[in-house]
Swiss-Prot record:
Family annotation (HAMAP family): Ribosomal_bL33
Stored InterPro entries: Ribosomal_bL33, Ribosomal_bL33_CS, Ribosomal_bL33_sf, Ribosomal_zn-bd
Organism: Piper cenocladum (Ant piper)
Name under which the protein is recorded: Large ribosomal subunit protein bL33c
Chief location bin: plastid
A GO CC annotation given for this chain: chloroplast
Disulfide bridge partners, by residue number: none
Keywords tagged on the record: Chloroplast, Plastid, Ribonucleoprotein, Ribosomal protein
PROSITE patterns according to UniProt: RIBOSOMAL_L33
GO molecular function per UniProt: structural constituent of ribosome
Similarity remark: Belongs to the bacterial ribosomal protein bL33 family.
Length: 68
């Protein structure tokens, strides 16, 4: 039986270094890396931060949760 609201929610993760650096001012393709994932509201009540690969920065960076 279902118990109220669903615990799992879909969240968007966005590269924090791309946003901070102003979308790479070099002659590379500009953009912001984003990932879609799920998190359990009961286990992680705060904002989610994961270390993922950013194709625009060409390295692993911290991706933070953003609002939809």
């Amino acid at each position: 039986m279902a118990k109220g609201k669903d615990a799992r929610v879909i969240v968007l993760l966005e590269c924090t270094s791309c946003v901070r650096n102003g979308f790479n001012k070099q002659k590379k393709p500009s953009g912001v890396s984003r990932y879609i994932t799920q998190r359990n509201r009961h286990n992680t009540p705060g904002r989610l931060e994961l270390r993922k690969f950013c194709p625009y920065c060409h390295k692993h960076t911290i991706h933070g949760e953003i609002k939809k």
